[in-house]
A protein has these predicted regions:
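Extracellular protease catalytic domains of secreted zymogens
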Residues: 1-233
């Protein structure tokens, strides 16, 4: 079983905005993990898990502040939509017909991410000292750890391992995942120096979350360990 960070896929130059996904996160045999953060009271409730959001009067300022993490997502140009995901992707295409871009990405491609987890403010040890890091490089290991603990518990109970996680996720979405209804992923992660100003680049188009069971921002939502253990007995 493999988990992989969906990564930061927006280009750091607004003139080169394009839809793209990375391998191996886009492989149908990999569980792709996106990222969330706690809402700051903008379009969401404070503390509610969201993908990147804007809030406050100064949108440029908030884009810089809250593009510290961004959940990459989209559709593969190399892999077709796998059978286990087909219904979820088709539902997204129909329910978001008036919101999403009509072109620029492969509508019949493998969609990522599959699910998401918190990607903000992980405590780490870097270069002989403590550090705080953020990104899907934190959320992917979090999911891997949850599944490893679940498999260990199942082993103690004399049960088989969970196996290929994607089948479980898409077949039991509402039973084991929590919906993420706010956020988008059209901005780059972090910030960069543009014309002497530290700013985040946001493309005119991107994907948003919340209007279907699965979306190319947070996937099916965030995994509940307790719900997973109940459904997987």
């Amino acid at each position: 079983m493999y988990w992989y960070s969906a990564g930061y896929l927006a280009r750091n130059d607004s003139r080169k905005c394009q839809y793209t996904v990375a391998f191996p996160a886009s492989c149908p045999w990999v569980t792709s993990v996106g990222g969330t953060m706690n809402g700051q009271g903008g379009t969401s409730q404070r503390g509610e898990p969201v993908a990147l959001e804007e809030w406050g009067a100064n949108s440029e300022e908030t884009k810089t502040m809250f593009a510290k993490i961004t959940s990459a997502g989209g559709f593969s140009n190399h892999f077709h939509t796998p059978a286990y995901q087909k219904y979820a992707v088709e539902e997204y295409m129909i329910s978001n017909a008036g919101k999403r871009a009509k072109s620029g990405y492969n509508r019949s491609g493998r969609g990522i991410p599959d699910l998401s987890a918190n990607a903000l403010n992980f405590q780490a040890w870097i270069d002989a000292g403590p550090a705080t890091i953020s990104g899907t490089s934190g959320s992917a290991p979090s999911i891997a750890g949850m599944i490893s603990v679940a498999n260990a518990q199942r082993g103690k109970n004399g049960q088989k391992r969970l196996g290929f996680l994607n089948l479980l996720l898409y077949n039991h979405t509402t039973a084991i995942l929590n919906s993420i209804v706010h956020g988008y992923n059209n901005c780059t992660a972090g910030s960069q120096l543009i014309n002497g100003t530290d700013s985040t680049v946001c493309c005119e188009e991107g994907f948003s979350s919340g209007s279907s069971e699965w979306d190319p921002v947070v996937g099916l939502g965030s995994l509940s360990y307790l719900k997973l253990m109940n459904i997987a007995q």
